[in-house]
Amino acid sequence: MKHTSLVLLTTLCTGISNMSVAAETSTVSVDNADRIRPYVKDVRYWQYKGEPVLLLGGTKDDNLFQIPDLKQHLDLLASVGGNYVRNTMSARLDKGFEVHAFRRLPDGKYDLDGWNDEYWTRFENLLRWTHERDIIIQIELWDRFDYTDARGANHWQVSPYRPQNNINYTGEETGLADRYLDDPWRDKHPFFHTIPGMKRYDKKYDMLRHYQEQFVAKMLSHSLSYGNVLYCMDNETSTLPEWGQHWMGFIRKAAAEQGVDVYVTDMFDDGWKPERSEKIRLELDHPELYSFVEISQVNSRNFGEDHWRRLQWVVEEVKRHPRPINNTKIYGAGKTSWGSGEPENGVQRFWRDIIGGCASARFHRDGGGTGLQPISQASIKAARKLESLVKLWDVEPRNDLLEDRSENEAYLAARPGEAYALYFTDGGSVGLDLTGSEGEFQLSWINVGTGDWADKQMLQSGNVVTIAAPAAGGWVAAITRHDSQD
């Protein structure tokens, strides 16, 4: 049995290691000022290379760096205007092409002190190819579904961290069991309780945390050189916040050693009901810990006006400590029992997120969402056309300017008297209050279902103007002062 000597430090209250992270692999050079960061003129949004950006995306897998046709998939995303991907550091052996991060020995066991070069080459390729295409990556370090045997998943059975699968420690030494059959949301796996001070922490877990930190340090040796990376600690975690806060501190310390700025957050499972979530409250109240707000779970279980209401609750609360609000997952496929909805629900959520003041919107992978399917491509193309006339950082949600509006019929973002973005979920007509404005406005229709331009029309200001969508289905209208079109 091979063992590693541990040196436990108390650099921070969370026990962050003193491990220095050097850029061992990546050679790309990025000016710190050009890295992804909140937009200097409106911190609700991001800027990249000094320019404001609206992050839009959709991809077919969550551990994106593992897919064999990655470069082609990124090219397709970029071709429709996408600039945002999600990447979990997962290695679930679901589809036959995934590999683990650690060196596998001839007897089939893993050595957690050695690396699988293929895994890290794939990750480096993702970093390099997205960098070349100006695509922003939102990385998730940990996914609770990677370590469960619930419902026949058997992911823990093949995990290198399972004591029976490696040469580095035993179950007795670490307190790790042979099987974990509980659903991940129950948060019973010791893997997520390795931080001193957590309620379920046991000193036996220190050895496991050593290897966790070694893995994250290796990841950062690749990613910190790139300026197109955001960091989210977990996928829909139900673990206590101390877990994610440890990893946020670990990443910040490593970035500080290299003199670069990074932006970190966590994703909480109960974000679908944010007004009742103590963890979301913590995230909102502590911008010094959570650099941006990741609210993806609001895009599940919530439909129509309820989705808008809960999203706007977050938007209003964030005004106390303004930061970007990201949606790296928008559900909308499969009609699951827990509320993913159908594809049209995903499209509506995507547009409510954009009109509602969010900094990013990405369709969840196939199976949970519509990924980069044609329906997603059309919405991304339509959103870019809208953005060509109405910059979302120049407007804010203003449904109060709409009259004769039915529930979930239409949503508005506006800078009154200057620019309006009006989204219809499925045809319909509403009154738009243009009183107090002067001159003419040009309305340009965009078909959400195809991503194509449609008709234009002129609107006279000074009163409430009735606007009717050209047909059934999703439509968005870009309404701007006529003199701004000249």
Task: Spell out what each predicted region is.
Residues 7-18:
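Bacterial N-terminal signal peptides
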Residues 283-293, 351-360:
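Structural recognition of alpha->loop->beta junctions
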Residues 292-301, 305-344:
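Active-site clefts of carbohydrate-active enzymes
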Residues 87, 233-234, 295, 327, ...:
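Conserved beta-strand positions
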Residues 20-23:
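Boundary at the C-terminal end of the N-terminal hydrophobic targeting segment
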Residues 324-325, 332-336, 342-457, 466-486:
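Aromatic- and carboxylate-lined catalytic core of secreted/periplasmic carbohydrate-active enzymes
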